[in-house]
């Protein structure tokens, strides 16, 4: 072949190469490997989160129980104060002078103003 024929073949090959887009080689996907330390850290973090959740829920349950007990005690205090007021009113009613004089007459006693002592 002559030099001209070789040049023609080379030119034809270059045109074919120019016309066809170059094929890119597929790059293999590289898996990101998780190291043992990273796995340990992930497990520790998840464990800590679980512990924190359980502790939080436990504390909430404990606070609820304490609030229920406090409400019960407050209710008992209010009830006792009401009972104390009723008893104080009864004491005042029973310690009136007219009632004491009536009981004294019933038992045959006389009230002597010189001999009366105040207890209050």
Swiss-Prot record:
Cited Pfam families: DivIC
Chief location: membrane
Membrane spanning stretches: 37-57
Keywords: Cell cycle, Cell division, Cell membrane, Membrane, Transmembrane, Transmembrane helix
Location in the cell: Cell membrane
Extracellular side: 58-120
Cited function: Essential cell division protein.
Originating organism: Bacillus cereus (strain ATCC 14579 / DSM 31 / CCUG 7414 / JCM 2152 / NBRC 15305 / NCIMB 9373 / NCTC 2599 / NRRL B-3711)
Signal peptide: none
Full protein name: Cell division protein FtsL
Family the UniProt entry places it in: Belongs to the FtsL family.
GO-annotated cellular components: cell division site; plasma membrane
Membrane topology: Single-pass type II membrane protein
Segments in the Cytoplasmic topological domain: 1-36
Lineage: Bacteria, Bacillati, Bacillota, Bacilli, Bacillales
Originating gene: ftsL
């Amino acid at each position: 072949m002559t030099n001209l024929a070789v040049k023609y073949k080379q030119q034809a090959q270059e045109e074919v190469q120019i016309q066809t887009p170059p094929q890119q080689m597929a790059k293999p996907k590289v898996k990101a490997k998780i190291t043992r330390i990273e796995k340990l850290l992930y497990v520790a973090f998840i464990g800590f989160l679980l512990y924190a959740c359980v502790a939080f829920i436990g504390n909430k349950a404990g606070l609820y129980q304490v609030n229920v007990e406090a409400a019960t005690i407050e209710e008992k205090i209010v009830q006792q104060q009401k009972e104390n007021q009723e008893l104080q009113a009864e004491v005042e009613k029973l310690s009136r002078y007219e009632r004491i004089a009536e009981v004294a007459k019933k038992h045959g006693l006389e009230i002597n103003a010189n001999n009366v002592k105040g207890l209050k």
